[in-house]
């Protein structure tokens, strides 16, 4: 009897062990995943990205749908190209999607992502962001630097006047980059730092650093191939550049500490003043301060310059829009001097021109998110840790939203399309939306409008000297995840005699 019981128990145990995986397979509901294109072993769908990922992802979405699942190596990637799902991510489930994926560049330049742009959502991140939004980039602070912006734009227009008087060409791309960098330097550090001023070329240092954020690293997606990044030398190169940038910014902070200004005159002074305030609950050290400064340079230099560069490109391609804008500017700025910010505030068509440039050429065409927990989107199961890419470039060229002429440059459309920058609007997201909305919108727009108004009022523009022909700049894009011109915008300015 005892042997029978032992045999029965063993049989039951073996049956249970054998049937458990089978029962689990039967009873467990298989997750419902979005459509996916066929992928290769090891690399997944990486081979399908191409030189301009926003365009290639858009092409794939036309075939597989506005919600599709790709695999970049071992990493699952959800690509979103429709406004309703974008709204779910940035509004309905904004808290679940408040994080951003990390990368090797973020780990090196931003200490693993402890800054405002890439930091994980939480109390520390909210406190650090408030330093930028409440103390540094609020409307009052942006307006306080009005004279500074007008001074630097005067420097730019004087250079253009010199080129005009000698019929010389100008690298407008480089000039706009210098403008934005010099303004950010003065606002952040207290003065300009460039080769012309006899100092370090901070512009080149920032631009070289920024380029790494758009590069592909094997280790980010295929850990077993991380050694390729190491032997290529890119790791050491990033660390070397980051060390130079950190040393420079640290020396700037120390210079301000030694000066001990009683009245703050720039961002470093303000941050040091906040740091001394014992009533503040959030405490930050020197490394946190340097990360905030990096955020200011990385997010403010190239993006604003690129916006202006593309807008000038489109205006030169559409002389009727250039003329309409010139007429509006001259109707409010009736003197022969530079346009002021107070005059710019009255110009509605100028606002439309800026918005149309951002719609067609967003400097950040792909918005990245990382869900902190499992979530359902349109009936599909999305696992925590899935990388999410919102194709803002595709959203802002969607014919269902913008009409059949969605790919055409037409600033007038913004007179009746009431899509704002500050709202969580999933159809127009050049600065992102939700908790990850870019805090520097006000700074960028004020500078873009003022610079563009002066470029258009003071000068006429040609690609070449001679008879007017097919004198239009191209729209070729550089390779990478940012939408930048492939070739610099080389132009011939001439004084516009309008009064």
UniProtKB/Swiss-Prot annotation:
E.C. no: 1.14.-.-
Transmembrane region(s): 3-23
MF terms in GO: heme binding; iron ion binding; monooxygenase activity; oxidoreductase activity, acting on paired donors, with incorporation or reduction of molecular oxygen
Pfam families on file: p450
Cofactor(s) recorded in Swiss-Prot or TrEMBL: heme
GO cellular component term of the entry, any: membrane
Keyword Transmembrane helix: yes
Residues the record lists as binding heme: 438
Keyword Transmembrane: yes
Topological type in the membrane: Single-pass membrane protein
InterPro entries: Cyt_P450, Cyt_P450_CS, Cyt_P450_E_grp-I, Cyt_P450_sf
Subcellular location per the Swiss-Prot or TrEMBL entry: Membrane
Keyword terms, alphabetized: Heme, Iron, Membrane, Metal-binding, Monooxygenase, Oxidoreductase, Transmembrane, Transmembrane helix
Main location: membrane
Similarity comment text for this entry: Belongs to the cytochrome P450 family.
Name under which the protein is recorded: Cytochrome P450 71A27
Taxonomic source organism: Arabidopsis thaliana
Gene expressing this chain: CYP71A27
């Amino acid at each position: 009897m005892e042997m029978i019981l032992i045999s029965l128990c063993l049989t039951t145990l073996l049956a249970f062990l054998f049937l458990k995986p089978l029962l689990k397979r039967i009873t467990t509901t298989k997750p419902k995943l979005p459509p996916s294109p066929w992928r290769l072993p090891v690399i997944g769908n990486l081979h399908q990205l191409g030189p301009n990922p926003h365009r290639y992802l858009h092409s794939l979405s036309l075939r597989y749908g506005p919600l599709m699942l790709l695999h970049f190596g071992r990493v699952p990637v959800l690509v979103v190209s429709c406004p309703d799902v974008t709204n779910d991510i940035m509004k309905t489930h904004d808290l679940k999607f408040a994080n951003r994926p990390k990368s090797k560049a973020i780990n090196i330049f931003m200490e693993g992502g402890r800054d405002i742009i890439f930091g994980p959502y939480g109390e520390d991140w909210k406190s650090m962001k408030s330093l930028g939004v409440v103390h540094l980039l609020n409307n009052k602070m942006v307006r306080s630097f009005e004279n500074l912006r007008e001074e630097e734009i005067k420097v730019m227009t004087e250079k253009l006047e010199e080129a005009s008087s000698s019929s010389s060409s100008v690298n407008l791309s480089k000039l706009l980059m210098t403008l934005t960098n010099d303004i950010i330097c003065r606002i952040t550090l207290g003065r300009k730092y460039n080769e012309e001023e006899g100092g370090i070329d901070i512009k080149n240092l920032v631009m070289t650093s920024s380029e790494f954020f758009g590069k592909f690293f094997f280790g980010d997606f295929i850990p077993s191939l991380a050694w390729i990044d190491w032997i290529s030398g890119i790791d050491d190169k990033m660390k070397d550049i980051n060390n130079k940038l950190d040393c420079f910014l640290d020396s700037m902070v120390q210079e301000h500490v030694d000066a001990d200004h009683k009245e703050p005159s720039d961002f470093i002074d303000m941050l040091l003043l906040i740091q001394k305030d014992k009533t503040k609950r959030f405490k930050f050290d020197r490394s946190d301060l340097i990360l905030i400064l990096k955020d200011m340079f990385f997010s403010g230099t190239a993006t604003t310059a690129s916006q202006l560069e593309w807008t000038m490109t489109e205006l030169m391609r559409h002389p009727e829009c250039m003329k309409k804008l010139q007429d509006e500017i001259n109707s409010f700025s009736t003197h022969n001097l530079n346009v002021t910010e107070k005059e710019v505030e009255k110009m509605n068509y100028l606002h439309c021109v800026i918005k149309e440039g951002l719609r067609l050429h967003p400097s950040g065409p792909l918005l990245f998110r990382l869900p902190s927990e499992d979530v359902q989107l349109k009936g599909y199961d999305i696992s925590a840790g899935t990388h999410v890419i919102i194709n803002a470039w595709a959203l802002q060229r969607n014919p269902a939203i913008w009409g059949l002429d969605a790919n055409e440059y037409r600033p007038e459309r913004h007179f009746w399309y009431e899509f704002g920058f500050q709202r969580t609007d999933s159809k127009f997201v050049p600065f992102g939306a939700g908790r990850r909305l870019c805090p520097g919108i006000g700074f960028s727009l004020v500078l873009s409008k003022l610079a563009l108004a002066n470029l258009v009022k003071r000068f006429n523009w040609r690609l070449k000297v001679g008879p007017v022909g097919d004198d239009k700049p191209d729209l070729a894009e550089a390779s990478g995840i940012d939408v930048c011109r492939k070739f610099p915008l080389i132009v011939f300015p001439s004084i516009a005699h309008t009064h």
